[in-house]
Structure formats: structure tokens, C-alpha cells
């Protein structure tokens, strides 16, 4: 078993697990930390950003073509790239994504790179996710694409990606890595095509993968529809512990029972804010919000259009009334705002028990339905469709994007940033708030960092791992050492789990200590009826048997031996025959590739393409839509149900293998 780490950061995981001739992708996270290096996409021709001076140096001017393609701008004492922000999808050079059999998505935050794979990599396998994950993930993608497309950015070349240019830049730009793999966002068409390929699953639903593994999703408690995935064969159990939560919020609680006693447990998604308690941060959020409103200022909350947002609305529903601020308007601005709020109210079976009860009464499970009914919460898709006519201050505005590089949050930063009465409150932990604010400096408005991250912290994760008792633990290497900003906090690590441990980093290929010890074999009825068990001691009976082991669709069947049938002397047909004895053939040695190709051509299979790598051979038969995989220990024939073709290939193979 091997694990390939093709994701670029711990917070945006993308892993490929190779097990029993299958390739399983676990999550498809998109690294968006790269957008911090770009100037914001402003809705209007902003004076500050439009008048930024280009930056250069003597070394850069000597590089041919740089001056004509100089995208570097200086703002707030540091450099930014003045172009459409680019993101970093999973690494494509480590493994061929067209060979991936299935993609398992754990939550809607970890599927944002999916269009890059489904539309541009040759992938044609299956994708599984829960219904809320599919719909809310679609909303997140469409919001991002809308933000990017409505503010077209003039492209002035990619000279800034040149290695010689990067070496001449000041920090942090000179520390950038993998810039050649950065890409602009996909299109709305890509999103729709991608979403159409995802198959919805329910919790605990059993999915068959090539007859080898049973896949099932189980609640992780992190967000609506979030899942931990279980991969089970007859004798192995592999668990993927994705971002999970033990806090009692709106999703179904974490189902940890199914994760116990795994042969391999892969853990990702421990909190990005390890020293910040979500309940305490929620209290700080409300306190800062109320103090700003009482002073006549406005509050901007850069956020995603789902997730913690629902909990913030629920908190403000009662808090503003108790603070005698019930008449302060709350605005939720997003291209997918209506869709997000609507879905939150109809996914009753994915909610915690208390909210499920409300759905069946029937009552709205979330209080934001009451806020909408009372016109205290007002929803807009953008700033120019009726927003200005209902806009009143002081107010609270929830809008995207948390990075402050896309969306309507950029506009509010521009118009409110000059006043010290206003406050921007960061609740999403995915983007360092100082990085997000950097291009807006100097800034008069107050800033508050209240990261509300319900994911497991290290103490909770360590407690959970002791209860789950896996035989082998796999985790990012960064979990084994304290965070960079808290180097002395040794408690902010995954402790010795009491089992074997494998850690990984970006682009690592980890060999996991699990091998195929047993396989289930079914004995054919014809063979089992011939068995004559002999009792050797009470409760134990044994019998010898001889048969032919048949492998098809990764299922093993023991069939009766074939008989060598010859016509009787003097007979013209094969109707009358005598049993000359059982056919006994023992194969040994290796297949000679040239002999095998000749044997195929002798049987009419002439269109043969061979690819060889490290002792392994892949033989493509384009005309027959088939493929043969040969390696040192096994042979696989893939004919998509063409039994006649499979038999011809088998006979050609047997002709080339020594036997006695």
C-alpha cells in the first residue's frame, strides 16, 4: 500500500491511496494561500490600487522581456502581483490522474480543486460525496468564479514566474514555490460539468469499488454533509479521518464508533487555530461587534457563504436583542446567498437532533429564517441589484471573500477602511488576517481576529486517537512538531499514538505497512459437493481438494479441474469421448514480452501498444478497448466484459509461460 501526497498544504489535502490495484483519491483541496501575493480585484476603478507604482530593480531590468511584462506593484510597504489571482491545484507530476479509480470528498471545502482534475487531467473515474457537500461545494465554486469573472484583470504576461525574476525579488515573493503550477480559476462551465459527474451518497451507504473494497461515508460533525470515509476489504480496514468536530453545532455529530480498530488510520484537518477556543472566539466576536455598533460604526465580516456563517446568524439572533441592537440591519451579500440559506433549511436529515426535531414539526431549523421574516437579515446577490436603496448604517455585512482579494468585501474595505469607527472581524482561520490586510495598509478601521474553527484541536485529536486504537497511524509531518508561531507549545502536537506511525509532506510517497495476508475464495457448488470431510477432533473436520483458481472482477472462485477430452478412435466428431484424465498444468517463470505480443498477433490482435516502466508493462489494445497490466507478481486483463477477447488474451498468455 502506498500513499501519495499531491496536495500543496495541510489545510487543503489531496491524497492518493494505492491499494489492491486501485487508486483512491482522498479529497481534492485547492491551495488558495497563493492569492495573498496578488492585489485585490476591485469592483470599481479604485484610486489607491490603480495608482500603485510598478516596482523594479537593476537586476530585473537586465532580464530580457521583464520591463514589458512587469506585474509587480508596491502597496503598504511590500510587493504584490498585479494580475488576476492564481491558485495552486494538486500536483499532477507525481501520479497520473487518469489512472485514479475514484475520488472521495469529505466536505465542501475540500472539493474546490475538483474541476481542474475532472476537466483537464483525463480523469474518468467515479466521484462520491454527500448531497449537501455537492450542492454547497457547487455554491462555493460558483461564488469564487463569479467574483473573478465580474472584475476582468488585464493580463500582462507571466514574467514574474521566471526563476531568475523570483530570485531577485524581496521577501516573501522570493520564497514562492511551485509558481509554474499556479493557475487562474476555472470557468462556470467547468463547475457545472464537474458537479454533474459527482454521485451523491448517504451516510453508511455501502459502495463497491471494483469488487475489491467496500466504501462508506460517516458523519464527521464538521459541517453539513461532512464525512469520514471507511475503506474495507474482507480482511483490511482503512479509515480516513478528515476534518471532524466534537462541538455541538448544527451538523450531525461525529460518528467515531465505525473508526475503531482500523488497520490504517489517515488523519488530516486538525484545527488551523490551535490556541483559540471556538466558544470563546464567538463571545469575542459578539463583544467587538456590539461595541462598534454602539459607537455608530459598521462591521464587516469576510466569510464563506456557508458553514460557521449559520452559527453566527444564530448567535446574533438573540445577542443583538439582548444588547438592545435588534434594529441594526444585517446584510448577507453573495452570488449564492439565496441558495445557501435555502439548502440549510431543507437538509434536515444532515442536521443535529435538536434541529431535525424542528424540521419535522415543521419549523425552520435555523433562526436566520426568522431574521429574514422580520427583515432584520437582508440578502443580496451583489451590490448593484437593489442593495443601495435598502442600505442603512450602522450595520453588519457578511460577504466574501475571506482572503480580501475577491468579492464585495474588497469594496467595503475600500469605503470603510478610512474610518476608525468601523471594524473588520475575521472569523475564518484559512487566511492569515495580517496577510489579508497587507495591500490595504495604512488602514484606519479596527481589525479583530476571532477565528472560529470547530475542527478537532490537538487535545481532542489525541484523546480520540487513544479511543480509536488504530494499528497504524498516518498523518502530516507538521502534526508531530509545534506550530511555527508557537514553537514552545509541545502540547500542540499529535502525541505518541501507541502504534506504528508514518508521516508525510508535500510530494511524499509513503509506503504503509499493510499487505494482503488473506483473500476470500468461494468454492464452486460442483467442487464442494465432492468434498468428504474427515473429523480429526471435536469440532474440526478437514478435507483435501484440487481445483482451478479463477479470478474475475477481483473475485476468487475455486472451480473443478478441467478434463482432457479426446475423441474416440474412429469417431468423426467430438460427441463421444473418453475421459483420459485430468488436465494438470503448473505455470512458472515470467512472461517474455516479445513472445506475448507475437502470440497476440497470431490470434488476430494486431493493434498493440506497449509502455514499460521499472519492470512493469502496460499493453494497450486500442481497437478492442482493452488493457493488459504485467508486473513481476501479477497479471491483469481489463476487457470491459468482452469474454471472447479475454479468453484469446488468456490463451496467448498461457502460450508464453513455461509450464509442466
Swiss-Prot record:
Subcellular location: Nucleus; Cytoplasm
Keywords from the UniProt entry: Cytoplasm, Nucleus
CDD domains hit by this protein: Int9-like_MBL-fold
Family matches, as Gene3D superfamilies: 3.40.50.10890, Ribonuclease Z/Hydroxyacylglutathione hydrolase-like
Gene Ontology cellular component annotations, sorted alphabetically: cytoplasm; INTAC complex; integrator complex; nucleus
Pfam families linked to this entry: Beta-Casp, IntS9_C, Lactamase_B_6
Main location per the UniProt record: nucleus
SUPFAM superfamilies xrefs: Metallo-hydrolase/oxidoreductase
GO terms, biological process: RNA polymerase II transcription initiation surveillance; snRNA 3'-end processing
InterPro entries: Beta_Casp (IPR022712), Integrator_9su (IPR027074), IntS9-like_C (IPR048660), Metallo-B-lactamas (IPR001279), RibonucZ/Hydroxyglut_hydro (IPR036866)
Quaternary organization: Component of the Integrator complex. The core complex associates with protein phosphatase 2A subunits, to form the Integrator-PP2A (INTAC) complex.
Family: Belongs to the metallo-beta-lactamase superfamily. RNA-metabolizing metallo-beta-lactamase-like family. INTS9 subfamily.
Function: Component of the integrator complex, a multiprotein complex that terminates RNA polymerase II (Pol II) transcription in the promoter-proximal region of genes.
Protein name: Integrator complex subunit 9 homolog
Gene name of this polypeptide: ints9
Amino acid at each position: 500500500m502506498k500513499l501519495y501526497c499531491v496536495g500543496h498544504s495541510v489545510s487543503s489535502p489531496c491524497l492518493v491511496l494505492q491499494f489492491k490495484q486501485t487508486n483512491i483519491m482522498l479529497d481534492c483541496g485547492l491551495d488558495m494561500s497563493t492569492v495573498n501575493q496578488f492585489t485585490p480585484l476591485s469592483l470599481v476603478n479604485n484610486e489607491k490600487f490603480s495608482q500603485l507604482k510598478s516596482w523594479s530593480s537593476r537586476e530585473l531590468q537586465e532580464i530580457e522581456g521583464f520591463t514589458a511584462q512587469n506585474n509587480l506593484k508596491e502597496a503598504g510597504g511590500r510587493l504584490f502581483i498585479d494580475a488576476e489571482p492564481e491558485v495552486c491545484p494538486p500536483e499532477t507530476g507525481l501520479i497520473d490522474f487518469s489512472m485514479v479509480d475514484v475520488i472521495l470528498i469529505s466536505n465542501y471545502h475540500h472539493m474546490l480543486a475538483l474541476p481542474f482534475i475532472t476537466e483537464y487531467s483525463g480523469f474518468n473515474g467515479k466521484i462520491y460525496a454527500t448531497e449537501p457537500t455537492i450542492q454547497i461545494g457547487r455554491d462555493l465554486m460558483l461564488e469564487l468564479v463569479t467574483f473573478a469573472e465580474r472584475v476582468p484583470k488585464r493580463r500582462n504576461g507571466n514574467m514574474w514566474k521566471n526563476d531568475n525574476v523570483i530570485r531577485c525579488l524581496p521577501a516573501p515573493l522570493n520564497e514562492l514555490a511551485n509558481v509554474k503550477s499556479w493557475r487562474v480559476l476555472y470557468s462556470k462551465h467547468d463547475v457545472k460539468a464537474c458537479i454533474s459527474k459527482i454521485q451523491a451518497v448517504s451516510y453508511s451507504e455501502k459502495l463497491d469499488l471494483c469488487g475489491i473494497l467496500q466504501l462508506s461515508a460517516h458523519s464527521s460533525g464538521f459541517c453539513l454533509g461532512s464525512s469520514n470515509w471507511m475503506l474495507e476489504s474482507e480482511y483490511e480496514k482503512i479509515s480516513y479521518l478528515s476534518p471532524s468536530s466534537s462541538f455541538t453545532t448544527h451538523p450531525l455529530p461525529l460518528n467515531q464508533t465505525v473508526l475503531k480498530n482500523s488497520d490504517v488510520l489517515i488523519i488530516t484537518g486538525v484545527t488551523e487555530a490551535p490556541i483559540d477556543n471556538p466558544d470563546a472566539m464567538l463571545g469575542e466576536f459578539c463583544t467587538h461587534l456590539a461595541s462598534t455598533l454602539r459607537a455608530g460604526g459598521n462591521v464587516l465580516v469576510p466569510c464563506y457563504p456557508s458553514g460557521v456563517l449559520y452559527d453566527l446568524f444564530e448567535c446574533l439572533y438573540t445577542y443583538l436583542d439582548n444588547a438592545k441592537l435588534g434594529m441594526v440591519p444585517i446584510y448577507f451579500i453573495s452570488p449564492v446567498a439565496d441558495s445557501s440559506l435555502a439548502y440549510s433549511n431543507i437538509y434536515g436529515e444532515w442536521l443535529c437532533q435538536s434541529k431535525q426535531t424542528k424540521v419535522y414539526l415543521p419549523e425552520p431549523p435555523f433562526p436566520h429564517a426568522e431574521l429574514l421574516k422580520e427583515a432584520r437579515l437582508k440578502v443580496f446577490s451583489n451590490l448593484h441589484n437593489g442593495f443601495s436603496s435598502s442600505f442603512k448604517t450602522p450595520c453588519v455585512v457578511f460577504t466574501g471573500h475571506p482572503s480580501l482579494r475577491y468579492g464585495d468585501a474588497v469594496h467595503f474595505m475600500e469605503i470603510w477602511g478610512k474610518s476608525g469607527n468601523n471594524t473588520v472581524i475575521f472569523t475564518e482561520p484559512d487566511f492569515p488576517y495580517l496577510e489579508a490586510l497587507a495591500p490595504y495598509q495604512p488602514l484606519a478601521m479596527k481589525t479583530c481576529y476571532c477565528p472560529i474553527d470547530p475542527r478537532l484541536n490537538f487535545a481532542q485529536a489525541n484523546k480520540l486517537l487513544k479511543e480509536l486504537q488504530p494499528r497504524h497511524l498516518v498523518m502530516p509531518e507538521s502534526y508531530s512538531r509545534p506550530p511555527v508561531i508557537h514553537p514552545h507549545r509541545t502540547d500542540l502536537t499529535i502525541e505518541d499514538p501507541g502504534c506504528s506511525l508514518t508521516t508525510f509532506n508535500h510530494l511524499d510517497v509513503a509506503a504503509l505497512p499493510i499487505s494482503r495476508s488473506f483473500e476470500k475464495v468461494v468454492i464452486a457448488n460442483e467442487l464442494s459437493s465432492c468434498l468428504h470431510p474427515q473429523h480429526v477432533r471435536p469440532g474440526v473436520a478437514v478435507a483435501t481438494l484440487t481445483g482451478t483458481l479463477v479470478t474475475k472482477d477481483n473475485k476468487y472462485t475455486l472451480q473443478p479441474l478441467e478434463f482432457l477430452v479426446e475423441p474416440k478412435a474412429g469417431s468423426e466428431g467430438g460427441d463421444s469421448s473418453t475421459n483420459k484424465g485430468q488436465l494438470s498444468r503448473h505455470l512458472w517463470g515470467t512472461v517474455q514480452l516479445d513472445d506475448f505480443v507475437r502470440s497476440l498477433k497470431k490470434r488476430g490482435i494486431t493493434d498493440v501498444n506497449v509502455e514499460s516502466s521499472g519492470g512493469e508493462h502496460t499493453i494497450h489494445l486500442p481497437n478492442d478497448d482493452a488493457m493488459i497490466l504485467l508486473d513481476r507478481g501479477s497479471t491483469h486483463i481489463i476487457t470491459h466484459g468482452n469474454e471472447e477477447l479475454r479468453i484469446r488474451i488468456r490463451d496467448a498468455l498461457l502460450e508464453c509461460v513455461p509450464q509442466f
